[in-house]
């Protein structure tokens, strides 16, 4: 359903976020909100319309640790996405490895995902990369569960 910007919506967005919305009809609310914003997110779902997300300026990073881990890198490569994944045994004071061998047998360059959560600046190098996240332990987490959760 199409959304028409109204003065109430305009005022709210302008006062809350400092974003000016041109008065026009929008195809969806998300298209209206994305003017002046740079939305990004992580997703485990591989059935998203990644082409439409890119067209709308909605930056997505795939997340390791779901039921689609067996094909997540195929999807990442097809759509030019990176994959965020926890790594085991890397202390906060140590750098993440330069590359990680994924379960598909391929070696991928890494980005230190703990430096910032802002994935939009990661850029595209022509190949997917692993956004390496140091494992944050949770109460009751066994070594076996921790290792199973991590990509490497």
Predicted regions and their residues:
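Class I S-adenosyl-L-methionine
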Residues: 1-152
């Amino acid at each position: 359903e199409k959304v028409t910007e109204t003065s109430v919506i305009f005022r709210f967005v302008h006062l809350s976020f400092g974003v000016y919305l041109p008065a026009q009809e929008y195809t969806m609310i998300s298209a209206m909100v994305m003017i002046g914003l740079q939305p990004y997110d992580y997703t485990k779902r591989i059935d998203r319309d990644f082409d439409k997300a890119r067209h709308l300026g909605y930056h997505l990073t795939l997340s390791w640790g779901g039921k689609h881990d067996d094909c997540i890198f195929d999807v990442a490569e097809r759509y030019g996405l990176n994959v965020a994944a926890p790594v085991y045994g890397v202390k906060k004071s140590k750098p993440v490895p330069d590359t990680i061998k994924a379960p598909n047998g391929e070696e991928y360059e890494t980005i230190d995902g703990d430096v910032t959560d802002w994935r939009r600046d990661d850029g595209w190098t022509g190949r997917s990369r692993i956004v390496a996240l140091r494992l944050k332990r949770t109460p009751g987490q066994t070594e076996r569960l921790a290792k199973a959760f991590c990509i490497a």
